[in-house]
Amino acid sequence: MKLKSIMSQCQFIIGATSIKSLPDFSIPEVALAGRSNVGKSSLINAITNNRKNARISSKPGCTRQINFYLINKGLMVLVDLPGYGYSKADRATVNSYICLMEYYLLNRKNLSKVVLLIDAKVGFKEIDLDFIRWLEVHQILYQLVLTKIDRVQSNVLDVIVSDIQNFNLNFIIYPIINVSSKCKQGIEELIYEIAQCIKK
């Protein structure tokens, strides 16, 4: 099966707002995580080649639920997690979806890995490192993706990658992928890495 065709059929299933509303799948899941406004929705639309699949907002913290997308009629599930960091939502709402996200990550047996997005324009921040440390503590596999690379020079990307590699990380999956949803750069490589969960 060609890489692009793997993600070509994408169907939104549900936006879970509580533990009880989390759907029960037995097929592999790959979750997208990252800071608020890191570009998760744009990336979903880029890898599925459909601008209408995920709603894009310029306001940070727009995603306040866990969105599930069925890929290729049941080949796998792509999961869009709420962004961490700044949000215009009240504290109770933020705490609610953070707890939901933590529950999902800790209890999802069919979760193959987390694709953690880092905004290349903003850089690698302490809040990103905190999330990585949390994943490490709980032994959750993750792969890093630098987004919006069309907005920065290549030497900036090198610095970010170098900073990340300075840490002793045991559950990271390499390579670190550079992508631009706008220019479609790195999208095919990312699809390939996501599709590895199907082969397991």
Curated annotation (Swiss-Prot):
Key word Transmembrane present: no
Domain EngB-type G: 26-200
Residues noted as binding GTP in the record, renumbered to the chain: 34-41, 61-65, 80-83, 147-150, 179-181
Coiled coil: none
Gene Ontology molecular-function annotations: GTP binding; metal ion binding
PROSITE patterns membership: G_ENGB (PS51706)
Transmembrane segments: none
GO BP, sorted A to Z: division septum assembly
Known cofactor(s): Mg(2+)
Record carries keyword Transferase: no
UniProt keywords, alphabetically: Cell cycle, Cell division, GTP-binding, Magnesium, Metal-binding, Nucleotide-binding, Septation
Annotated residues for binding of Mg(2+): S41, T63
Superkingdom field: Bacteria
InterPro entries hit by this protein: G_ENGB_dom, GTP-bd, GTP-bd_ribosome_bio_YsxC, P-loop_NTPase
The family this protein is said to belong to: Belongs to the TRAFAC class TrmE-Era-EngA-EngB-Septin-like GTPase superfamily. EngB GTPase family.
Protein purpose: Necessary for normal cell division and for the maintenance of normal septation.
NCBIfam families, alphabetized: GTPase_YsxC
Designated name of the protein: Probable GTP-binding protein EngB
Organism: Ehrlichia ruminantium (strain Welgevonden)
